[in-house]
Amino acid sequence: MVRIAGTDIPDNKQVYFSLQYIFGIGPARSEKVLVQAGVDKTIRVNKLTDEEINRLREIIDKEYRVEGDLRKEITLNIKRLIDIGCYRGIRHKHNLPVRGQRTKTNARTRRGPRKTVAGRGQKRGATKK
């Protein structure tokens, strides 16, 4: 397996798809890196020469923020929003949707499982016999 930016890249896949295993590299950026390195995107990783692998490594390391650095930046950005107390920061702090989605219904993924309320679901005034 080839290791680029701290991530093991699968050998048996095409380079175009293998690069997308790196956090921070999607389809568009993968294609851009391959064009810069002068590597055909349909070639398999195990067929790459050491020179091509080194070119890919250099381009990714120099020009793009990926993996740990990117994760750290995202975390710090969210922490900054929380610290300054802006609307988005408050939404992050309370684990609610940040981008204006409705929360009366839906938003279950962000809000977590339903919390049961005592006495809820029983008919009022109903007596057991």
From Swiss-Prot:
> Which family is it part of?
Belongs to the universal ribosomal protein uS13 family.
Read off the InterPro entries from this record: Rbsml_uS13_C, Ribosomal_uS13, Ribosomal_uS13-like_H2TH, Ribosomal_uS13_bac-type, Ribosomal_uS13_CS
Summary of the function given for this chain in its UniProt record: Located at the top of the head of the 30S subunit, it contacts several helices of the 16S rRNA. In the 70S ribosome it contacts the 23S rRNA (bridge B1a) and protein L5 of the 50S subunit (bridge B1b), connecting the 2 subunits; these bridges are implicated in subunit movement. Contacts the tRNAs in the A and P-sites.
- Biological process GO terms, please? translation
KW Transmembrane (keyword) present: no
List, as start-end ranges, the regions of compositional bias called Basic residues. Answer: 95-114
User: Self-association or partners: how does it assemble?
Assistant: Part of the 30S ribosomal subunit. Forms a loose heterodimer with protein S19. Forms two bridges to the 50S subunit in the 70S ribosome.
Q: Which organism is it from?
A: Dehalococcoides mccartyi (strain ATCC BAA-2100 / JCM 16839 / KCTC 5957 / BAV1)
User: What is the protein named?
Assistant: Small ribosomal subunit protein uS13
**Source domain of life:** Bacteria
**One cellular component (GO) term of this entry:** cytosol
Q: Which UniProt keywords apply?
A: Ribonucleoprotein, Ribosomal protein, RNA-binding, rRNA-binding, tRNA-binding
Which HAMAP family does the annotation name?
Answer: Ribosomal_uS13 (MF_01315)
